[in-house]
């Protein structure tokens, strides 16, 4: 099978995924009250150790930007690489879904940010109400260049964010 890494809006689904979707296609309660949604909520609750609810969305853009909107106020900022997916491929969706949050662009090799490059971007921001203050850090996994963050790299960014 030839692999093509299209947008989630244009790519075809793998035959195994399609078969699973067809097997799950049965009448049920809608609006998150169905059996599959409850099973997914239970699986996430077990994984995170507290009650969690999954939000089903149709596209990756909606998933990315709704997640940002849940974390970042309209007056806040999201630190990301200047070639991060949310900067280069989501159009104006991050600002739209967050009602105005700004992307704070950091540098880094092959579209990967590090604690050092994040701190460099943050060092350009003055404290106070006249500049957007950071509220989240976003990484693209894998990057637009196909590079992957290691668990240690993600942990180092998480430590900085904490």
Question: For each predicted feature, which ranges?
Answer:
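N-terminal amphipathic/basic leader segments beginning at the initiator methionine
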Residues: 1-20
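Glycine-rich loop at the start of a catalytic domain that most often binds anionic cofactors/ligands
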Residues: 66-75, 93
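Glycine/threonine-rich beta-strand-loop-alpha-helix active-site module
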Residues: 76-91, 95-98, 111, 116
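PLP-dependent aminotransferase-class I/II
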Residues: 98-144, 148-156
């Amino acid at each position: 099978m030839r692999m093509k890494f299209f947008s989630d809006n244009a790519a075809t689904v793998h035959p195994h995924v399609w078969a699973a979707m067809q097997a799950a296609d049965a009448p049920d309660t809608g609006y998150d009250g169905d059996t599959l949604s409850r099973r997914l909520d239970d699986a996430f609750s077990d994984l995170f150790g507290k009650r969690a609810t999954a939000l089903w969305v149709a596209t990756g853009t909606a998933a990315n930007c709704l997640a940002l909107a849940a974390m970042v106020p309209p007056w806040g900022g999201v630190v990301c690489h200047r070639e991060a997916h949310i900067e280069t491929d989501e159009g104006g969706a991050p600002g739209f879904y967050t009602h105005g949050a700004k992307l704070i662009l950091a540098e880094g090799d092959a579209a990967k940010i590090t604690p050092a490059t994040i701190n460099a971007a943050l060092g350009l921001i003055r404290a106070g109400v006249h500049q957007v203050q950071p509220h989240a850090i976003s990484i693209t996994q894998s990057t637009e260049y196909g590079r992957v963050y290691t668990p240690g790299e993600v942990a180092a960014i998480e430590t900085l964010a904490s």
